[in-house]
């Protein structure tokens, strides 16, 4: 950039040099001569100073006043109304930085003064406490000294008492003497009553020895001084010191008692009330007020119970009822030498962008041609030996219905290869794949596919992914972009090299000598072999014969197959295998662990099943209760019931999610039954009982099911592409919606004159201005564009001839059935009602 002197700058801004130097000095700049150089930052400082001096700084409004006026009408009886106008005015003041700083200083001063006052108060309290302690010590010392003096003079006291007694006149009332004679006889009885009363007010029963004790000897008469202390003797109203001492009075609590409530994953209303020390009816009443009608024995889920306890003012401690799970985690020991393992790579991207074709080239196998419709509908797991080492690949579907599968693939992986077609760009599933990878914290390697096409534009891909925070390495980011062609094999070696380089950076380790641990990628029900689960071993070694626990299922590994279907005896880290021998089909994403014995596996599996059932029931019940008031008074939705069977668990989940999302306020889809495997007799009976349609995705019905379908006339359909199921269900829902009546305006005629007819009454002489007027069609009579009559066109004539229709620009006579109040200037609108099919 060229340097500018003060003189040149003065010429540019058309001002004298002396004035410019004066302004620069006011702005705090060091320039004193016309030949000194002015930098860009100094120009900016000068411009800011000049703007401030010319009042631009104050051009911003410091105060905004909003005025709001609302007018309402108040009825005061009869037809009288009073207009009430409410005006509200609010002023918002923008404070300057100096005012903000002064406010902050004032708050600091107030805080400091409050702290000082608190400190002085604490010092005064401490001084008062010290003074009280010293006074107490002095009082104790004086009391001890007085006791010593009393002990020293104790010897002379009896003589003094005797002298005093001799000096007293012997003149006591007879009643006192009589009472003194009878008191020794009453004394033992009173003591027994006292003992009995004492025993009544204590929790302990007297021992046998205490019962057999000899009664105590009679005590000496009590002096009248004791009576003056507030004791009354004899009579029914007699009071004793023991009764006063042993009786406990109820004290009202000074504040609400806050209790700690332990809430597991499920809890009944009665258990929750007991922990809060309130009646169950109170909790039921409170939940009714919250809009949740419950019973005292109803099971609540953890979230609902937490909300209720917190609303009632108690502390909540969420506890996990996972003692068995914790014991299982402690028993799993991964000891041994950790070695480097192969990376698990997930291939993700939009549908038809070439993910499976790229894997085909790497594996030298034709998988894409075998997938129905050319799209991947399962998670494929393969491991490939390359020159630089082994790599395990997971291929995920790209269709929108397979969101859960893609998320599952990202969580079981180390590196994500994001395949983007160079001729298509960043698409919705591409964005979703980036979100899944970032949520799992997995590094991304971008493969820009189809670069052999002439319309390929790799720069467009970089710009699109940079907007999603995937920055190429050449732009200073951390995501390698590798141009490849799955068709020609261009750039595949560079892609594998980039993947293995990322794996080296991650330093992936595993312990092959430990028991196997992994994750379920996919599961299905095979007719000949039973439940089959595709498992990716993540750590340790899985061997044939191991007892495994997979989610809520367990079993002994009877056989293991690699991705080519060949039997193997063991599988190390990062190896995908199919295992046989489980008692059911686990959900994809469930964790697999090798346990010591079958007893432990069965115990944990049954515990998980029970917990899963409880949580599911609690949530289902809560959902029903929430909707009970919303649905009250509304028309019931039309429901399409479906029994759905698929070949693998992942496809079943994807289909259930997609079908449940269809529908609107009037129609809905309900999957009444679903599972993995072929269509059986029980599925057909379920469809018959629930009036449902049977859908089979890549599966077929057995002979018993086909017999029921034919006999009962059930609707059963087979599919192998997910698009076809969704389209058919949409069509069925559209048919259930029914149709709408739509009005089409056929023509408009303007009344020019009115005639009288003995047969039809008033006849309107009209000019057809728009469209065409038809006989025997419904009409509306409009006066000043307001509908005043709706009826039927009875007579339509032209030159005394009855006609069926009259076109625009022609005159005609119109007779309206049962209406004679036609006037000049009215418009007659002829229309028809058409039934139109509705859509979702």
UniProtKB/Swiss-Prot annotation:
Major site of localization recorded for this protein: cytoplasm
Q: Where is this region: G4?
A: 449-452
- UniProt subcellular location: Cytoplasm
Read off the CDD domains from this record.
Answer: IF2_eIF5B, IF2_mtIF2_II, mtIF2_IVc
Q: Where is the composition biased (Basic residues)?
A: 233-247
* Region of interest called G1, as start-end residue ranges on this chain: 349-356
- Which residue stretches belong to region G2? 374-378
Single annotated GO MF: GTPase activity
Which ranges carry the tr-type G domain? 340-509
* Pfam families in alphabetical order: EF-G_D2, GTP_EFTU, IF-2, IF2_assoc, IF2_N
Q: Where is the composition biased (Low complexity)?
A: 144-157
Listed GO CC annotations: cytosol
For binding GTP, which residues are annotated in this chain's numbering?
349-356, 395-399, 449-452
Q: What does the UniProt record say this protein does? A: One of the essential components for the initiation of protein synthesis. Protects formylmethionyl-tRNA from spontaneous hydrolysis and promotes its binding to the 30S ribosomal subunits. Also involved in the hydrolysis of GTP during the formation of the 70S ribosomal complex.
Q: Which HAMAP family match?
A: IF_2_B (MF_00100_B)
Protein name per its UniProtKB record? Translation initiation factor IF-2
Q: Which species?
A: Pseudomonas aeruginosa (strain UCBPP-PA14)
Organism placement in taxonomy: Bacteria, Pseudomonadati, Pseudomonadota, Gammaproteobacteria, Pseudomonadales
Query: Gene behind this chain?
Result: infB
């Amino acid at each position: 950039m060229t340097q500018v002197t003060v003189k040149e700058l003065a010429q540019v801004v058309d001002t004298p040099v002396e004035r410019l130097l004066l302004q620069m000095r006011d702005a705090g700049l060091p320039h004193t001569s016309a030949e000194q150089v002015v930098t860009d930052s100094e120009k900016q400082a000068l411009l800011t100073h000049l703007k401030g001096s010319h009042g631009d700084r104050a051009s911003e409004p410091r105060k905004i006043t909003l005025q709001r006026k609302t007018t309402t009408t108040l009825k005061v009886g009869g037809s009288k109304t009073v207009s009430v106008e409410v005006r509200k005015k609010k002023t918002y003041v923008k404070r300057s930085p100096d005012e903000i700083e002064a406010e902050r200083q004032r708050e600091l001063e107030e805080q400091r003064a409050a702290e000082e006052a608190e400190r002085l108060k604490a010092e005064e309290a401490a001084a008062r406490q010290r003074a009280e302690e010293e006074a107490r010590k002095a009082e104790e010392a004086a009391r001890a000294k007085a006791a010593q003096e009393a002990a020293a003079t104790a010897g002379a006291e009896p003589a003094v008492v005797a002298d005093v007694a001799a000096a007293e006149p012997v003149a006591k009332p007879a009643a006192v003497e009589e009472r003194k004679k009878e008191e020794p006889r009453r004394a033992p009885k009173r003591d027994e009553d006292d003992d009995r009363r004492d025993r009544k007010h204590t929790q302990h029963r007297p021992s046998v020895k205490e019962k057999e004790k000899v009664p105590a000897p009679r005590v000496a008469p009590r002096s009248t001084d004791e009576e003056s202390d507030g004791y009354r003797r004899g009579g029914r109203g007699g009071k004793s010191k023991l009764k006063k001492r042993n009786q406990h009075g109820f004290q009202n609590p000074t504040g609400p008692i806050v209790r700690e409530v332990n809430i597991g994953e499920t809890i009944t209303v009665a258990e929750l009330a007991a922990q809060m020390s309130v009646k169950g009816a109170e909790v039921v009443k409170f939940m009714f007020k919250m809009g949740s009608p419950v019973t005292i024995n109803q099971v609540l889920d953890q979230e609902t119970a937490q909300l209720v306890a917190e609303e009632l003012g108690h502390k909540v401690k969420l506890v996990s009822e996972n003692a068995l799970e914790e014991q299982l985690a402690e028993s799993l020991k991964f000891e041994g030498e950790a070695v480097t393992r192969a990376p698990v790579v997930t291939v993700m991207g939009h549908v038809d962008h070439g993910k499976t074709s790229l894997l085909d080239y790497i594996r030298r196998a034709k998988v894409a041609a075998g997938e129905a419709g050319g799209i991947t509908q399962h998670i494929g797991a393969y491991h490939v030996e390359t020159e630089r080492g082994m790599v395990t690949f997971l291929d995920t579907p790209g269709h929108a219905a397979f969101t859960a599968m893609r998320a599952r693939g990202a969580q079981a992986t180390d590196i994500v290869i994001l395949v983007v077609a160079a001729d298509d760009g960043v698409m919705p599933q591409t964005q979703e794949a980036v979100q899944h990878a970032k949520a799992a914290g997995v590094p991304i390697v971008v493969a820009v596919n189809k670069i052999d096409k002439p319309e390929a534009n790799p720069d467009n891909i970089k710009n699109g992914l940079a907007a999603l925070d995937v920055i190429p390495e050449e732009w200073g980011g951390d995501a390698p972009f590798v141009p490849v062609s799955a068709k020609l094999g261009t750039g595949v070696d560079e892609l594998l090299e980039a993947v293995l380089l990322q794996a080296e950076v991650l330093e992936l380790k595993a312990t092959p000598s430990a028991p196997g641990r992994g994750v379920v990628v996919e599961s299905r029900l095979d007719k000949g072999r039973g439940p089959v689960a595709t498992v990716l071993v993540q750590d340790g070694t899985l061997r044939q014969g191991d007892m495994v626990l997979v989610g809520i299922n367990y079993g002994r590994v009877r056989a293991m197959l690699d991705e080519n279907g060949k039997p193997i005896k063991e599988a190390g880290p990062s190896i995908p295998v199919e295992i046989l021998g489980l008692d059911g089909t686990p959900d994809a994403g469930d964790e697999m662990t090798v346990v010591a014995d079958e007893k432990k596996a069965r115990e944990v599996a049954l515990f998980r099943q029970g917990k899963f059932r409880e949580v599911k029931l609690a949530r289902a019940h809560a959902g029903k209760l929430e909707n009970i008031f919303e649905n009250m008074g509304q028309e019931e939705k039309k429901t399409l019931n479906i029994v759905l069977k698929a070949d693998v668990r992942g496809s079943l989940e994807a289909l259930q999610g997609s079908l449940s999302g269809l529908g609107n306020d009037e129609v809905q889809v309900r999957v009444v039954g679903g599972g993995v495997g072929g269509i059986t007799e029980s599925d057909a009976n379920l469809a018959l009982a629930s009036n449902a349609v049977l859908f089979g995705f890549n599966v077929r019905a057995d002979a018993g099911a086909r017999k029921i379908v034919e006999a009962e006339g059930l609707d059963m359909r087979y599919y192998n592409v997910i698009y076809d199921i969704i389209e058919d269900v949409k069509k069925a829902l559209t048919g259930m919606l029914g149709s709408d009546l739509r009005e089409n305006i056929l023509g408009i005629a303007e009344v020019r004159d009115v005639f009288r007819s003995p047969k039809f009454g008033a006849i309107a002489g009209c000019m057809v201005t728009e469209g065409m007027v038809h006989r025997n069609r419904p009409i509306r009579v409009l006066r000043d564009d307001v509908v005043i009559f709706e009826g039927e066109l009875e007579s339509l004539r032209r030159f005394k001839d009855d006609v069926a229709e009259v076109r625009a620009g022609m005159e005609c006579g119109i007779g309206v059935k049962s209406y004679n109040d036609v006037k000049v200037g009215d418009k007659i609108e002829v229309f028809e009602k058409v039934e139109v099919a509705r859509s979702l």
